[in-house]
Amino acid sequence: MRRLVRALAIVAVMGAGVLAIAPARHAALRSTGRILVASDQPQPADLIVTDVESGPAGLLTIGDLHRSQPNAAVGVLVPRATRIDAEMQQRGIVLPNLTVEMLAQLGIREDAIVRIPAGEGGTSETTRALGEWGRSNPGKRVLVVVGPSHGRRYRRALRRAWPDGHLAPIVITAPYALFRAEDWWQSRTTVREGLVELEKLALDYARHPW
């Protein structure tokens, strides 16, 4: 009986230890997620735009923002054509423009859309393209929607690319994205996304400590 009681006590202590570790681990993972998910407060803007990588989640957020500020232009960052695009064009293959079609279904008119050439469409290219747009449109406020895991790194890159003396850009994260700071480690998809972004953010701080 004593052995049984002792064994149960050991199991209880071990179980309590595991339960104590799990909340601490989850708290650390949530804190790690919040490092990535940096977001400004939404403000009225002259141009609202989503980065290339945020996909439908970013476009849904654009739709919400445009309903509250219908006079704002909607920016679409357009990566340059690739060899694959050229080959499809040569063969007469025309793919639907899903971005423009989704914006139309969200109630955004074609004449409200501003197309902005964005090089290869990565973070460096899109932030540089937006910086050039800001330089060409002084006094205009720009609001950019990005994926949550991309928030801090994109905001840092955009501020570096932004012209001095112009209204600072606003960067907010898409609430419809799969990545959430509260539970990103519970899905392989978001775990992969989070780890990749943590690595990229660390590299960004190494290259640009300020």
Predicted regions and their residues:
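A transmembrane-helix-recognition feature enriched in membrane-embedded lipid enzymes
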Residues: 186-210
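A short, flexible N-terminal coil/short beta segment enriched in small residues
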Residues: 1-17, 71-72, 81-90
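N-terminal type II signal-anchor transmembrane helix
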Residues: 2-38
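A structural signal for short, hydrophobic/glycine-enriched beta-strand patches
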Residues: 24-185
